[in-house]
UniProtKB/Swiss-Prot annotation:
Acts as a component of the essential kinetochore-associated NDC80 complex, which is required for chromosome segregation and spindle checkpoint activity. Keywords: Cell cycle, Cell division, Centromere, Chromosome, Coiled coil, Kinetochore, Mitosis, Nucleus. This is Probable kinetochore protein NDC80. InterPro entries: Kinetochore_Ndc80, Ndc80_CH, Ndc80_sf. It is found in: Nucleus; Chromosome, Centromere, Kinetochore. One of its GO terms (molecular function) is microtubule binding. Residues 1-10 have a biased composition (Basic residues). Component of the NDC80 complex, which consists of NDC80, NUF2, SPC24 and SPC25. Its main location: nucleus. GO terms for cellular component: Ndc80 complex; nucleus. Residues 1-84 are annotated as: Disordered. One of its GO terms (biological process) is attachment of mitotic spindle microtubules to kinetochore. It comes from Yarrowia lipolytica (strain CLIB 122 / E 150) (Yeast). Residues 321-387, 473-592 form a coiled coil.
Amino acid sequence: MNASAHKKRLSMMPGTSSASRPSMAGLPQRNNPPPQREPATPAVSELMRSSRRSMAFGRNPRQSSFGLVPQTPMAPMHTRDPRPVRDRHYQQQISQQIYEYLVTNHFEQETRHPLNQRTLSNPTQKDFKTMFEWIFRRIDPGYPFHKSIENEVHAVLRAAKYPWLDSITKSQIVAVGGQSWAYFSGMLHWMVELNTTIEKYHNHDYSGDDGPSLVDEIFNRHARESYFAYLQGDDRFARPDAELCLAEENAEFQEILAEQRAQNPLPEGEDDELDEELSRLEAKWGKIEEAKLLGKNLADDIVKLGAFVDARKEHNARYASQMSQATAEEDNVTSEVESLSRQKLKLQQTIQDQGLSPAELDKLHLDMERQQKALNSLDEIIDEGRQVVSNKESTALAVFDALDRVIKEYTSSVLSYNAWVASDNDLPEIPESVYLIDLREPLSEENLGRHPSVILGGVDPRNQIRPEIVRICNMVTSKVKALQEEALRLQEEIETNQEKLVSQKRHIGELEAKSRRLRETRNALEDSASMNENENSQNTERLENQFVQAQSETALAQSQLKGLQVRLQDAEHERNKLSVEVQQARERLSQDILKQAEVMVAFKAMVQTKLQDFEMFVRANVEEEIRGDHN
């Protein structure tokens, strides 16, 4: 590779003006179509689709951020390596390709590290580290290697999406060589192929393929320049020579278009013939569209005309049936008129045979009309009386039904109260004499004129039921107050338990923080213990004991927390239960008892008034009937 190509692959460190070959790790891949190039491995093709994008996330030029920022979690790769990496012939082939690549690109001069065939067949840990870092820096020049080699290799290959990462473990990276070197040489060969493919792409060397189209090439060129400007902190990329570049691209496009026309010329005169044929077809197509529109309008007119004809036929049929019906009615009326004329002649003949004069007939008619009017007036009076009696009876029945419903609701409420206080000795039950009310058919004849207390079975709602209900209501109110005080006491206890729970949670948080710090310390010691295990064994045991002690303290605190949570849940459950019972008892008893008392008092007054009115109405009707009989 020449020096100019090598200069294009500089790092994206801060302050560096070069924007070529930026880092690729850390950014999501776009769906830009890759250019056509020679075949490569699936992972190489996948990585090429990212177009060598940088890992930078900010607006200022910076170095590679891989290893400095958290990487996006990826699903583990479980693809089996299809390459025959354990085959000796294949190993020799890929080792030769790696060696040629390293020699061609001046590996020894840049790294000051010796290189020979033995280095690729039986390498040391330092050989592998030097080759790996040098090859990957050609992929990502801005990447800094800070961690140990076993951590760096895994992280770098995961970021580069090496498809067979499962075949390489950290323990194998610590001791490169032996049986595992076949997989490491395959990994280095994959990185060499990746570098080779990227270099061909940047040098527009598509090895006989068509490559990207002119439009794609122009777009990709502008996208690369815009992206590099974005990495340098320019959010609004605008080239100062935009018009000149546009003119150059247009000239390039016209030149390629002329070449394509020269390679594929049309026969002489064929273009004019095609234009004439197109004009003729367009004229025919306009006539066809007009014909289609005319046919559509005619079809609509035919449909409308058919609907009009059907409507007229239906109208004519309806008129014919009406005419036949009118003719039949006219014949019936004519026959009835003739029949009435014959009956009139017969009646006149009968009257003449009886010897009655017209004056006598008129007098008889007047008497008959007067008697008929008198009968009609009597019938109207009787109907009015029946209507009044029916209305009074329906009103009395409606009042009786309403009273019966009120008494049933009152009895049901008292029974519900007695069932509720059955388990509580502090509240008394309502005696049967208070809520057992029997109307004993108040509308029967034997109850006419009786006192309401007699009709209600000897129960006086005002002097017996109301005082008892007021006394029980006062007792229920005192019970509700006692339950409210108990609920306040439980609320105070719950608040105390909550404060204890908060303190326990704070203590648990401190213990968890201490445990987390100890765990982090232990992990750090375990990482360093792989290099110096004998020296740090005593410290590790001491930290493990502290960690176990912290875990035991955490378990004890968690058990105490669970106990407090159980007690808190029990107290909250008891408080909710008491609150619901108090609220239900207070609302139900206060409303139902007062409502029933008011209804019973109003019912007593209403029944007395209705019975007196009904008695006066019956007495008036009886006296009127007696006077009518005397008359």
